[in-house]
Amino acid sequence: MTFYDHTAIEPKWQAFWADNHTFKTGTDASKPKFYALDMFPYPSGAGLHVGHPEGYTATDILSRFKRAQGHNVLHPMGWDAFGLPAEQYAMDTGNDPAEFTAENIANFKRQINALGFSYDWDREVNTTDPNYYKWTQWIFTKLYEKGLAYEAEVPVNWVEELGTAIANEEVLPDGTSERGGYPVVRKPMRQWMLKITVYAERLLEDLEEVDWPESIKDMQRNWIGKSTGANVTFKVKDTDKNFTVFTTRPDTLFGATYAVLAPEHALVDAITTADQAEAVADYKRQASLKSDLARTDLAKEKTGVWTGSYAINPVNGKEIPVWIADYVLASYGTGAIMAVPAHDERDWEFAKQFNLDIIPVLEGGNVEEAAFTEDGLHINSGFLDGLDKASAIAKMVEWLEAEGVGNEKVTYRLRDWLFSRQRYWGEPIPIIHWEDGTSTAVPESELPLVLPVTKDIRPSGTGESPLANVTDWLEVTREDGVKGRRETNTMPQWAGSSWYYLRYIDPHNTEKLADEELLKQWLPVDIYVGGAEHAVLHLLYARFWHKVLYDLGVVPTKEPFQKLFNQGMILGTSYRDSRGALVATDKVEKRDGSFFHVETGEELEQAPAKMSKSLKNVVNPDDVVEQYGADTLRVYEMFMGPLDASIAWSEEGLEGSRKFLDRVYRLITTKEITEENSGALDKVYNETVKAVTEQVDQMKFNTAIAQLMVFVNAANKEDKLFSDYAKGFVQLIAPFAPHLGEELWQALTASGESISYVPWPSYDESKLVENDVEIVVQIKGKVKAKLVVAKDLSREELQEVALANEKVQAEIAGKDIIKVIAVPNKLVNIVIK
């Protein structure tokens, strides 16, 4: 039996593509464009795992498909190479993070090339290259000039073990850091912030213009968190102080029985009475040690301290106590709330805990038992009594504005983006602080501000980055003799990834970020494929920067990514014992189809789980390529199931994909190829072209492969294979298995040219209609023959054909035919005696 040798075929074609720059981006202005983008990887020391190629294979199939359909295709790859892991490695080993990063990139690139992806490597970008981050810094200076980058003393999420502050989005629900799982504490520090909040409404509205999964849009909508309501001003009794609260339910103001300020609220110290001062100070100290997520956890016990002061409820003049509690955040809304315990669960729990008044203002519910959080007509609410929710809100806002104690207000949950990091391995922020108290951006002519090479990259411990130790870089003097100090904070890893898709369009431009005409030609990105874990962070930040650049006239589109697709996760295999504990794969043996613990002999349960080093279930693509070939890996990952589903890795599935490709190879290389068309494969061939074309376009790659299998099965039943159908089939399979596609194309054409730009096959609509049908012939109710006849024969014609059949004649010889019942396109029933 013939098998193809992937170890010879695959390197041969990879070399051919590289030598001939086969995938150089097309520039023919008469052709339509297609921009296929992968989320570029962080080049870790571990290298690629089999999860990476799933998304990469999908965009590669689309790119190859679109090239064959006559598009100019931009399909680039690069490296998101700044970030904590390289710096941590450098601190642990004493090596330069730049060297470590370069080694990792070389390894990633080797692995990616071994998988046969059709990237235009002339456009490769690396976020740590000064020629690249010159433009990251340039964007920052534009943000600074527009007032969108500013410094503020803010409570940050400080991670002692990482020596840096992290963004809210990088804190996990359990209050630990996303990177490393370390404790996060709140600490006031001077930080650079980006005013993403200015763009909140546009970030929300423009989600309507993009073809993204609704789940991702919802995550962004929730993160932006638009609320429409009212600001209400409360005076503090016996003082000239007041505070403002934002509420989405101003109609419940009559039910506000206490107010709560965030422990960090500027008013707290001023209104705290002497006898409460110690308790308040102690509570503030405890709150400062908790992350925002820990403080707002709905399940946690309610804590708080009374300030000793009262506020006046503006609508009824009642005195209400003012408390501080950590579930109110200074950074959210106004940092103060009015509490309506009768109709809010958290306020109700707090009121019960501290024995505060609970007054219902909506009818329906027993507020002694629980908060009533549904809608009802208003009660105990003066001029709002008897009104429904919408009417009452409108009337209360009108009253607040007329009385000068409030106004209608729209707020957002979104906070400004904490942009600085106290680490070495990141883009230097191009700002100089002068001794006269002013700060200026580094002029464009002096960009890039290059990260200095230094051995001393440990955090300074003072809250500044290690750059504070590099004095010859740090200290500068102006022409007028004024001394200055460079900004020591660096940018977060999100900076370089917020605009990289733009640089791919014009990667070698030294004069500007990218040429306007090229940006007009290629934007927006047509398909962006990557993991759903980037729903809020990267995608929101990239959209924000894109809108700033749109306002500056740099980019021609409002949105960067027209279509987004999230591939599923490839799960590994895990094993659990009777206690539910996970067992590493090297401690498992298979016997008679079951799995057992090597040491204890206990039978284990097999189940899918995320691949992890600790479970030793990570599959390295290098091993798969060596044993089965890259084409097998590509076909298997696309055939596992729908691209957006999470599916467990299976060695059996991999073997099945390899067997299929061997069958394809044998079909084309051993079957007699003929220039004459017998017509036997007309229908299945045209069905296959139609199905694969439509399904690739819709990214339904698993069903496209299934249809290719249908064709192979049908073709194998024939003695000969029509040349046009052989070539067309090879073209259809080439995007999935490109090395095999090239090899078989040469076997059929000997053209010496790549299959990549051969026009995509078309199908004949008329051949999709079945011209023949199979009918059964029954004698005495038993099937005696099956006949293929022309479709839509009349009853008489059908009867004639059936009675002329040899098998039928043998059955009815010497018998009397009582009746013949013919049903067109289905059957002939012969009754004999």
Swiss-Prot record:
Compartment(s) where it occurs, according to its Swiss-Prot or TrEMBL record: Cytoplasm
Source species of the chain: Streptococcus pyogenes serotype M3 (strain ATCC BAA-595 / MGAS315)
CDD domains: Anticodon_Ia_Leu_BEm, LeuRS_core
A GO CC term assigned to this protein in UniProt: cytosol
Motif 'KMSKS' region boundaries: 610-614
Family stated for the protein in its record: Belongs to the class-I aminoacyl-tRNA synthetase family.
Gene3D superfamilies registered for this protein in UniProt: HUPs, Isoleucyl-tRNA Synthetase, Domain 1, Valyl/Leucyl/Isoleucyl-tRNA synthetase, editing domain
Segments carrying motif 'HIGH' region: 41-52
Sites where the protein binds ATP: 613
Keyword annotations: Aminoacyl-tRNA synthetase, ATP-binding, Cytoplasm, Ligase, Nucleotide-binding, Protein biosynthesis
Identification of the protein by name: Leucine--tRNA ligase
Major localization listed first in the record, in broad terms: cytoplasm
Substrates-to-products reaction catalysed: tRNA(Leu) + L-leucine + ATP = L-leucyl-tRNA(Leu) + AMP + diphosphate
Gene Ontology MF: a single term: ATP binding
Keyword rRNA-binding among UniProt keywords: no
Domain of life: Bacteria
Record HAMAP family: Leu_tRNA_synth_B
GO biological process annotation, one example: leucyl-tRNA aminoacylation
EC code(s) of this entry: 6.1.1.4
Cross-referenced Pfam families: Anticodon_1 (PF08264), tRNA-synt_1 (PF00133), tRNA-synt_1_2 (PF13603), tRNA-synt_1g (PF09334)
Gene this chain is encoded by: leuS
